[in-house]
Amino acid sequence: MMATDTSLTTSQTFAANRAVGEVAVEVRADGGVTRRGPVHEAGSLRVRFPSPEQQGLSAVLVNTAGGVAGGDRFSISLDVQAHARLTLTTAAAEKVYRTHGPAAQLDIKLKVASGGHLAWLPQETILFDQARAERRIDIELADDASLLLSEMVIFGRSAMGETMQHGRFVDRWRMRRGGKLVFAETVRLDGDIASLFGRPAVLNGGVAIGTALIVPGDAALVERLREAADTFGAEVGISAWNGFAMARFCAQNAARLRADMMTILGRAAGRALPRLWLS
């Protein structure tokens, strides 16, 4: 009988089962109407445009893989050209599953040209226990571009009473405005991360965090947002510097975080949130 070489079976099988997805979207202004430019889709990522082209265009990002697993690689690029307007959300919360392999890689690039506006409003990212994910968010804005961005991360399936005990989450944000770096931050949680959650400087006992970023933003906007904060169930800090405003949340559960985030975004946007947020 001929011998079979199985030395690479495990690694080859793991690599073959990993999902890869890419989406690149360009939108352009044409006579006051925002229209789709080139759209590129590959692998398990898709983008859909549920509303007709009008003053602002809405888009929905869909992950047909049903979630994110170790070793997956996803790339999203949005290019909002001069005076165009785009709002993008996701079809559902993104789940990052447990893995004993390498971390999933998520690469997000957001570019907004002069007079353009982007609302990047994905639903929650839920990290299962022993999930491993590394995310990069790179933002490039013209001096007079505007941005409304939200990100929410849930550590464990809180609705099922599960808290993330071990895993890895690296979140790297960089924002440039007019070619100048105006915001840079990297969050790094690795290993026994549950032991960090109780620390006041980390999560202070919470299991859900959120960030809302508003450009441009000033002291007047901060005061308007703080007027709503007295009713929040989550801890929140709101401030402005370098021409933008930011609200940071830490909550005991995902539902509380989502409700408070919706209030902040509604005030910042001055218009209704995507319908998928309300379902």
From Swiss-Prot:
Required for maturation of urease via the functional incorporation of the urease nickel metallocenter. It is found in: Cytoplasm. This is Urease accessory protein UreD. The gene is ureD. It comes from the Bacteria. One of its GO terms (molecular function) is nickel cation binding. UreD, UreF and UreG form a complex that acts as a GTP-hydrolysis-dependent molecular chaperone, activating the urease apoprotein by helping to assemble the nickel containing metallocenter of UreC. The UreE protein probably delivers the nickel. The keyword Glycoprotein does not apply. Keywords: Chaperone, Cytoplasm, Nickel insertion. GO terms for cellular component: cytoplasm. Its main location: cytoplasm. Belongs to the UreD family. Signal peptide: none annotated. It holds the Pfam family UreD.
